[in-house]
């Protein structure tokens, strides 16, 4: 019987996704080769644990799928990223549209995005964004499916701190839900028209007000204390990666400034999303990466307005980064399969 490439990949992805999520603990706090996390047994904020290999640490960062995710962009991106064969994928949040009170709608959104994530065939580490947690229904869904909103893990001598900028979350005004989902529905029916009308829609007073409230960074004292304890328990990783949804360094957030102070003396990189616009800054010798989109709508023009992923490979001198546009990741037919990508 002839097995096609599609049959093989389908079986591979199905087998990978079926693996159980197991949290391994580190009794010594040392950064060894094996995966370890501080998350107890129960719901995990990742889809599967990385498998140990002898190759250097390599992972892929993906930007916002929402707000106003363009149909098919994120789904195809997960297939494209699978070609890169990363150890795992790291999300900067805004995975679902959210902003809805009905649990059935939120569950449907998670089910849809998890079907796309299953195409990766590798772990997908979640970071919560303001679209993922913004009311009781979305918070419940996150808690049931992904567990804690901030957590850490170590892998191949690197420490990863995944923070929450929605601690506590901010509710959007109820009056914005109906117009928001009118635009979401238009994106599904006529994406070209929706993309053309987006700037005027975002300028509506009720939408602009919701956007302003959504830009607020919330990091609790408890979370800052957890960061301090985690860094104390892991004093000498080869590198520390700090992941959060909103680029808190751009808003001069006092809580994040405390965390920056705790990172002094370490080799570290900070990675965020939210703005839908790519920027890179070198702050006191450290890389601060603000991811653009992986499906989310354009919010302003300019060279940073791209659908992309960033591939990271650890070397003896530190991380090596490559920025890859989705419409430049081509299959053997020379096709990205991304007609709506920027």
Give the ranges of each region predicted by the language model.
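Short, catalytically relevant binding-site loops at active-site mouths
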Residues: 167-169, 247-250, 277
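Active-site glycine-centered loops adjacent to acidic/histidine catalytic or metal-binding residues
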Residues: 64, 93-94, 129-130, 245, ...
């Amino acid at each position: 019987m002839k097995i096609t490439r599609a049959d093989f990949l389908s079986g591979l992805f199905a087998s990978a996704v079926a693996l159980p999520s197991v949290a391994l603990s580190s009794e010594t706090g040392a950064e060894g080769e094996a995966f370890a996390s501080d998350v107890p047994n129960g719901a995990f904020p990742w889809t599967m644990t990385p498998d140990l290999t002898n190759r250097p640490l390599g992972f892929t960062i993906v930007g916002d799928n929402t707000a106003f995710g363009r149909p098919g962009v994120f789904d195809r991106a997960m297939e494209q990223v699978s070609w890169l064969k990363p150890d795992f994928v790291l999300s900067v949040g805004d995975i679902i549209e959210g902003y809805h009170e009905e649990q059935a709608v939120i569950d449907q959104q998670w089910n849809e995005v998890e079907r796309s994530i299953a195409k990766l065939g590798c772990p997908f580490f979640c970071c919560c964004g303001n679209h993922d947690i913004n009311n009781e229904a979305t918070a419940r869904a996150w808690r049931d499916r992904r567990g804690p909103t901030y957590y850490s893990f170590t892998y191949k001598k690197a420490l990863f701190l995944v923070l929450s900028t929605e601690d506590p979350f901010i509710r959007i005004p109820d009056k914005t839900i109906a117009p928001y989902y009118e635009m979401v529905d238009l994106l599904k029916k006529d994406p070209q028209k929706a993309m053309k009308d987006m700037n005027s829609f975002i300028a509506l007073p009720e939408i602009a007000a919701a956007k302003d409230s959504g830009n607020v960074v919330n990091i609790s004292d408890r979370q800052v204390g957890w960061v301090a304890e985690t860094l104390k328990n892991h004093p000498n990783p080869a590198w520390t990666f700090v992941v959060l949804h909103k680029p808190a360094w751009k808003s001069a957030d006092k809580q994040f400034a405390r965390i920056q102070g705790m990172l002094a003396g370490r080799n570290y990189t900070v990675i965020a999303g939210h703005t839908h616009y790519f920027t890179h800054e070198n702050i006191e010798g450290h890389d601060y990466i603000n991811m653009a989109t992986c499906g989310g709508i354009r919010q302003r023009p300019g060279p940073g307005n791209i659908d992309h992923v960033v591939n990271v490979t650890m070397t003896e001198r530190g991380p090596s980064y490559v920025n890859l546009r989705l419409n430049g990741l081509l299959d053997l037919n020379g096709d990205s399969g991304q007609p709506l990508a920027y």
